[in-house]
């Protein structure tokens, strides 16, 4: 009876997370080549000795989730050491969205049940592009997050201010934290307290730009976000991680960078080649020593 009532089992989260979203940039063949490049031992992306402290995750398009899942399973089957249940897998698989119901008459939508069955572990939700183009609301994102968590999937919820930086730094930070709180609160209220959640802080004005937001701005806003989370739900048992996205890439993590401010990075186009990923991984590994 106890096992029947047990909640969903979530994958363990190491200290630092690097999550790559391919959006709709790659064809299926390029995605398959890309994940094989990530898993290729000669490319030195995934190091066995760092898996308990650094997690790499890939979020491809929906069409290639299954072949990516098969590639990861094949890679795991070739590992010399057996996989412990408490050790994070070498590469987590994610999806770019899901629906807020498990199954039903929802043409074109993506079921969290189906994602779970294809070994998906993380679901990206509420990206600024979906909020702007498709009109997704904070409440819809929260419902999706709850549906994902119900299936043992970790919600990766994108948050970030729309308002641009002003001349007064304290006011800009206050506005940013306030806008993020409006996006965070419904999610925390919808999720079970033992469910993990990842928030990807992406200032909308930094997405797709040549340069990311300034480190001091990110640090101040993320500090405010942590205070907001503590105030909203101080009794939460599930892990809460905060990543930075928004033109994140190589050179952003090392000395003087984001390593002490956030729990990882949400990577986009700057990780579209294997060399870029390797550079970021090496930067993070240096900080873990």
Swiss-Prot record:
An individual GO BP term: glycerol catabolic process
SUPFAM superfamilies to which the protein is assigned, alphabetical: Triosephosphate isomerase (TIM)
Binding site residues for substrate: 23
Pathway the protein takes part in: Carbohydrate biosynthesis; gluconeogenesis; Carbohydrate degradation; glycolysis; D-glyceraldehyde 3-phosphate from glycerone phosphate: step 1/1
Catalytic EC class: isomerase
Reaction equations catalysed: D-glyceraldehyde 3-phosphate = dihydroxyacetone phosphate
Active-site annotation: 127 (electrophile), 202 (proton acceptor)
Listed EC numbers: 5.3.1.1
A Pfam family this chain is assigned to: TIM
GO cellular component: cytosol
Keywords assigned by UniProt, alphabetized: Cytoplasm, Gluconeogenesis, Glycolysis, Isomerase
Family, per entry: Belongs to the triosephosphate isomerase family.
Protein name (database record): Putative triosephosphate isomerase
